[in-house]
């Protein structure tokens, strides 16, 4: 009789920063013969994204409380209790050998339900500062892993699992060899587009159009509006989305973008210099993510409050290709190519203990 397949329940949802690293770990374990099931919510991005990667998904009902009215806050205990019961039912039916929490609202009830069922919980924090759910779950998790060394004082640093295609790009030395002409600037606003970048970059290009070639990802529905802001004869390509981020990063001499955890880890994986404009948040999550590469000499940080076309022109004109190549090499040195493998190894270790 063949040995029974090991089963992993993955809890991750809400944003690509949680979901994509979790998919990377899930796919690695699938290649090792594991069975994977996903716990998510039906109204967030994981509902469409996860099945496309051939991973079955189950849903519970839970949402965040930030910015909600008094009625939602008063009903929160009932909503959380209901979500725990829903997660417990799924866990009882699936009987996983381990549960991986990668963040998002779904991880809270799922983690509690797993603990109640006696299933080992392995937690991974993608950001440089832990979110509320993960801060609480860390108290009941069997193992806590982190991408950056600042989220938890005693957790193992493993990096962020990212797509392997990012690591297979040519090295910075290979990419920069023989490059001439205008500096290649990639502007990435994310799935929503970063309005502040969409408004600022056209003015930068107006001042430096003879020195820059720009690819600008503006987000859904913004192409027409942003196109009208750019000078007519500038070397600019504008798109809603970029399907192949690995190739786009590799094309660029420098990337201007937000500093979500996944973006920072992807830039390190490829080895690309960056100008980060962190999203303003009270816990400084994106600023601390950006600092990881900035402290290594691989990036510059411009706080959003200080971002003007003049400031960006000043920063860009300080760079030449030799400087940007050295920054890219430093970024590559901060990459963690074995992150997905290491998270998977910890899951296997804990599953084998029970």
From Swiss-Prot:
Belongs to the glycosyltransferase 28 family. MurG subfamily. It is a peripheral membrane protein. Cell wall formation. Catalyzes the transfer of a GlcNAc subunit on undecaprenyl-pyrophosphoryl-MurNAc-pentapeptide (lipid intermediate I) to form undecaprenyl-pyrophosphoryl-MurNAc-(pentapeptide)GlcNAc (lipid intermediate II). InterPro entries: GlcNAc_MurG, Glyco_trans_28_C, GlycoTrans_28_N. This is UDP-N-acetylglucosamine--N-acetylmuramyl-(pentapeptide) pyrophosphoryl-undecaprenol N-acetylglucosamine transferase. Signal peptide: none annotated. PANTHER family: GLYCOSYLTRANSFERASE (PTHR21015:SF22), UDP-N-ACETYLGLUCOSAMINE--N-ACETYLMURAMYL-(PENTAPEPTIDE) PYROPHOSPHORYL-UNDECAPRENOL N-ACETYLGLUCOSAMINE TRANSFERASE 1 (PTHR21015). UDP-N-acetyl-alpha-D-glucosamine binds at residues 15-17, 127, 163, 191, 242, 261-266, 286. It catalyses: di-trans,octa-cis-undecaprenyl diphospho-N-acetyl-alpha-D-muramoyl-L-alanyl-D-glutamyl-meso-2,6-diaminopimeloyl-D-alanyl-D-alanine + UDP-N-acetyl-alpha-D-glucosamine = di-trans,octa-cis-undecaprenyl diphospho-[N-acetyl-alpha-D-glucosaminyl-(1->4)]-N-acetyl-alpha-D-muramoyl-L-alanyl-D-glutamyl-meso-2,6-diaminopimeloyl-D-alanyl-D-alanine + UDP + H(+). One of its GO terms (molecular function) is undecaprenyldiphospho-muramoylpentapeptide beta-N-acetylglucosaminyltransferase activity. It is found in: Cell inner membrane. One of its GO terms (cellular component) is plasma membrane. The keyword 4Fe-4S does not apply. It comes from the Bacteria. Keywords: Cell cycle, Cell division, Cell inner membrane, Cell membrane, Cell shape, Cell wall biogenesis/degradation, Glycosyltransferase, Membrane, Peptidoglycan synthesis, Transferase. Its main location: membrane. One of its GO terms (biological process) is cell division. Pathway: Cell wall biogenesis; peptidoglycan biosynthesis. Its EC number is 2.4.1.227. The lineage of its organism: Bacteria, Pseudomonadati, Pseudomonadota, Gammaproteobacteria, Pasteurellales.
